[in-house]
């Protein structure tokens, strides 16, 4: 039987996603990253929850700036990537790819997803069918390669697309509309992408959030995951290139978009 995980999602810091997860059985609550302590406190108050954990995906300031004020107020335990422990304020416990731990009734699997940063991780809760990818995989996009190579990011994305297609995807930023504009330059004849772009435009016109997505939806519409697609390969002039090279070219084009 699928266990119920309550999720509260909101936008803060202009385009960061704040995400709270709550296990109603144990009454435990965690925030995925801590972009804005004030916004997180307001969301907790709306739901009547108290904060127990911060699950850090990577060390960038817009994901950890709330760590210390939230720790001071709630006494939270901060979990984050072993490879970035020196850069994560207030960290209490380090984890790495392949590790597992429990959050209430839920098993949490840690996936190593470097590329955006050297030690970034994602948190996968199989019983809730949800993955939190930070700035590795976005709706219709992927993170910039600040501390990694295209090969590094490619292999991280390979791990994420191996998850079940009905896995819900939550990421770190509301970049989806701009990502859709770029995606249409790479994959303009993709009918699923065109329909999705229209829906995204409608949502954003009303200042509504475009997440969560799913792994299956991203595989059908996100050009950064469609390295196998023959039409995309032909458009890029990379019909016989390795998958990794196709991804690298798409990332290069996005950097210049």
Swiss-Prot record:
Cited Gene3D superfamilies: Ribonuclease Z/Hydroxyacylglutathione hydrolase-like
This enzyme's EC code(s): 3.1.2.6
Keywords: Hydrolase, Metal-binding, Zinc
Biological process terms in GO annotation: methylglyoxal catabolic process to D-lactate via S-lactoyl-glutathione
Residues that bind Zn(2+) 1: 58, 60, 116, 135
Cofactor note: Binds 2 Zn(2+) ions per subunit.
Pathway entry: Secondary metabolite metabolism; methylglyoxal degradation; (R)-lactate from methylglyoxal: step 2/2
SUPFAM superfamilies (UniProt xref): Metallo-hydrolase/oxidoreductase (SSF56281)
Residues at which Zn(2+) 2 binds: 62-63, 135, 173
Claim: Iron-sulfur is one of the keywords in the record: no
Reaction(s) this enzyme catalyzes, per UniProt: an S-(2-hydroxyacyl)glutathione + H2O = a 2-hydroxy carboxylate + glutathione + H(+)
Pfam families: HAGH_C, Lactamase_B
CDD domains, per the entry: hydroxyacylglutathione_hydrolase_MBL-fold (cd07723)
Cofactor dependence: Zn(2+)
Role summary: Thiolesterase that catalyzes the hydrolysis of S-D-lactoyl-glutathione to form glutathione and D-lactic acid.
Family: Belongs to the metallo-beta-lactamase superfamily. Glyoxalase II family.
Quaternary data: Monomer.
Protein name as catalogued: Hydroxyacylglutathione hydrolase
Organism: Brucella abortus (strain 2308)
